[in-house]
Amino acid sequence: MTTLHILGFPRVGAKRELKFAQERYWRKELAEQDLLDLAKALREKNWLHQAQADADFVTVGDFTFYDHILDLQVATGAIPARFGFDSQTLSLDQYFQLARGNKEQFAIEMTKWFDTNYHYLVPEFQKNTTFKANPTHYVNQIREAKAAGHQVKPVIVGPLTFLWLGKEKGEAFNRFDLLKQLVPIYFEILTSLAAEGVEWIQIDEPALALDLPQEWLAAYQDVYAQLAKVNAKLLLATYFGSVAEHADLLKALPVDGLHLDLVRAPEQLSAFEDYPKVLSAGVIDGRNIWRANLNRVLDVLEPLKAKFNQRLWIAPSCSLLHTPYDLAVETQLQQNNPELYRWLAFTLQKVAELQVLKQALNAGRSAVAEQLNDSQTAADARANSNVIHKAEVAQRLANLPTNADKRQSPFAERIKLQNKWLNLPLLPTTNIGSFPQTLEIRHARAAFKKGELSLADYEAAMKKEIEFVVRKQEELDLDVLVHGEAERNDMVEYFGELLDGFAFTKFGWVQSYGSRCVKPPVIYGDVTRPEPMTVRWSQYAQSLTDKVMKGMLTGPVTILQWSFVRNDIPRSTVCKQIGVALSDEVLDLEKAGIKVIQIDEPAIREGLPLKRADWDAYLQWAGEAFRLSYMGVKDDTQIHTHMCYSEFNDILPAIAGLDADVITIETSRSDMELLTAFADFKYPNDIGPGVYDIHSPRVPTAGEIEHLLRKALKVIPKERLWVNPDCGLKTRGWKETIEQLQVMVEVTKKLRAELAE
């Protein structure tokens, strides 16, 4: 018999019940016991769904109040010492303070979980870090599930991945040196789990899909030789990429089973066809929302069944944390777009797909002929749908001129033409894009969406806000203005709603971090722009002032990265389609007299593949898609882009290759350290390093901004330096926004006068 299991389940509930309960708890509107009871009910529901789908185990330990890596920091006693908390007696309030900060300490840093849109809390390791086992989190969930009558498989992230995901703090050392101390703690935790009578323990080691240094790889054998002494079977789970290059190492590990991601890396299967133990085949996509073609999946699984027999397990490719909960609640989508609805599968539907596969493997395809037929019909309809495939889009991409993604002239010539008409002072000041989104703006937008506010009244409200934003910028004496983006709910959703080929769900939420969830757009078909999206707002804003108004767009790579993307054509093709669609908007803005246009790309870096060898190909198509978004603009139109990350050094040639006339970057928190990379690289175009941190309501002093600008002037010629905040101001309040910008403009004017002498 084939075994069915799940690597992990979403935690937040079908309608984000956990999120709302957490936030009420933080506001002191909900008692701790009520939060604990709700969490228990959500876990029980998750286990029931798995059991009803004929899963041989329900997975426990995957539920968390904030983040599974934070839970592991608690379980190993590795919470940051700076908080002064005892991990053995940690209260729920203290747990949340680790994640959210308190009056004395800032929160633990967050970063992306591999190349997903989920964020984990980064462990802080010090030379003198000491570990201490506290398996309560896992043990309690095992007992709870067993009491409900379930067969249980706990999951825990493995020691090498856990260490790899952390950062060294304080005195210089290599966190790898902590492994010797950490492994006995893991042994203690696993022993506690085994003592609860579990047969299998799933240990996740996704770091194996990265380019790990040799000493880390070499450590796997010894680490797992120690952990294998635990009185339970160990399933080592890998995902997010191929581990084929480590096949010999993995076959030799003293574990009892291995999970492979056969969605992201189907080609790796051939390296493991002679694996002598349990092979868990990750055949249902845990990171996207499309139905699988179950007949095709069975074509892969049936030969494996013949080889592995009882040793074959089936599962999603990775945890289902990255997919929304239940398609059945999307009644509006089913009504408005029944065709698309038939092609989708959320978590519960994916579990049902696995159940069909299990039945087919155990009793033959005829036992589930109806379900397989339905799956095939949906796959065929999708392959041939004219809702998806538009001949004119493919034709337009195929017929792009050879140098479509190149500007007419090099930057040195363009900038002369731009400076001539822009006529800006030295160190021009601007804003990144958004201004505070007040409650009034949000209410007006919500009322309009619900049909409670007429189009005319909604537009009047937005125009009033735009005028307010323009007047404020004029009073502040900023040089290049923005319209403030009052009409935009989200920098990707706004464009997705206006581009063809996109759809939106109502409950398609996935966890980003803690209580924050995002609802990615669905890119299901060829992308086109039926009509202008931003032109009238920018044009209206420009009509209010004699100063230069900047148009604002989200770039193709960011739109791609923050969406659920169709899986029937390469991501690179989808990205280029978006770029070409955006170019129509850019040219319309240019025609309307908006000749400074910003195309934001905050997500270019996060799209980087996990393995270095794949970077060049990605950066090539991502760069091309970005350049296509402004194809055809005149030399005197100035293209800006904005990016916010802390690491540029390794991708600077690609950033320069975007050939934006001005790049604005987030640098204030790193004290301008980023700029040395741009200077060493001799970055050729204009740069606007952020001079204050917008993530804080704090108003910077004139001295702080002056210090940062003087540092910037040491590495960037004054003629090429712009002055701006780190990021958009959407989440700030108006009071601090005005005060922050006032200081920025005053300091700029002081330095301008000095430089003019």
Curated annotation (Swiss-Prot):
Specify which residues bind L-methionine according to the UniProt entry for this protein.
432-434, 485, 600
| Pathway it works in | Amino-acid biosynthesis; L-methionine biosynthesis via de novo pathway; L-methionine from L-homocysteine (MetE route): step 1/1
Q: Which reaction does it catalyse?
A: 5-methyltetrahydropteroyltri-L-glutamate + L-homocysteine = tetrahydropteroyltri-L-glutamate + L-methionine
> What cofactor is needed?
Zn(2+)
- Top-level taxonomic group: Bacteria
Q: Which residues participate in 5-methyltetrahydropteroyltri-L-glutamate binding?
A: 16-19, 112, 516-517, 562, 606
Q: Where is the active site?
A: 695
One Pfam family this chain carries?
Meth_synt_1
Entry keyword Transferase: yes
Q: Which InterPro entries match?
A: Cbl-indep_Met_Synth_N, Cobalamin-indep_Met_synthase, Met_Synth_C/arc, UROD/MetE-like_sf
- What EC designation does it have? 2.1.1.14
> What protein family does this chain belong to?
Belongs to the vitamin-B12 independent methionine synthase family.
- Protein task: Catalyzes the transfer of a methyl group from 5-methyltetrahydrofolate to homocysteine resulting in methionine formation.
* Name of this chain's protein: 5-methyltetrahydropteroyltriglutamate--homocysteine methyltransferase
